[in-house]
Amino acid sequence: DIPSLDLTNMVMQNADIILATGGPGMVKAAYSSGKPAVGVGPGNTPAIIDDSADIRLAVNSIIHSKTFDNGMICASEQSVTVLESIYKKVKEEFLYRGCYFLKPDELEKVRKTILINGALNAKIVGQKAAAIAEMAGVAVPPDTKEQLQVLHRR
């Protein structure tokens, strides 16, 4: 089929969940579809790991993408959604590969460091995860590859 708005709407009506990337029109259409939707704009790339995934490969790919150039490329993952049935294995793999899961109080410190008055703090751009944590007053191992936070679990 040739891509079209009609075809896109048909796919959205028959999907269980919609992951909409691209311009504001596409994201708005996904949110208006009546289906659960994750809408992202430029530079907010999500990843979804389901139970058919090769967990080791998925986690390694996400880390490789996110740590290349310290996440400067807008195509690097900004969020990861994981099925509950494989959550523990995925978390263990992230930990095994040098990632750090922020505790709630640490998350608040990091948030206040990366966002100042609702705008991105330019001082964190292109910095390694451990450097951002240090700026926030959070102690992480110096070889930490990425800082992660569990935002919602069901």
Where are the regions that the model predicts?
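Short acidic active-site motifs
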Residues: 6-7
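ALDH superfamily catalytic-core signature
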Residues: 27-154
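An anion/phosphate-binding loop that grips the pyrophosphate of nucleotide cofactors and donors
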Residues: 15
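Structural alpha-helical scaffold elements that stabilize or flank donor/cofactor-binding regions
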Residues: 10-11
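A glycine-rich phosphate/pyrophosphate-binding beta-strand-loop-alpha-helix module
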Residues: 1
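Glycine-rich phosphate-binding loop
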Residues: 18-30
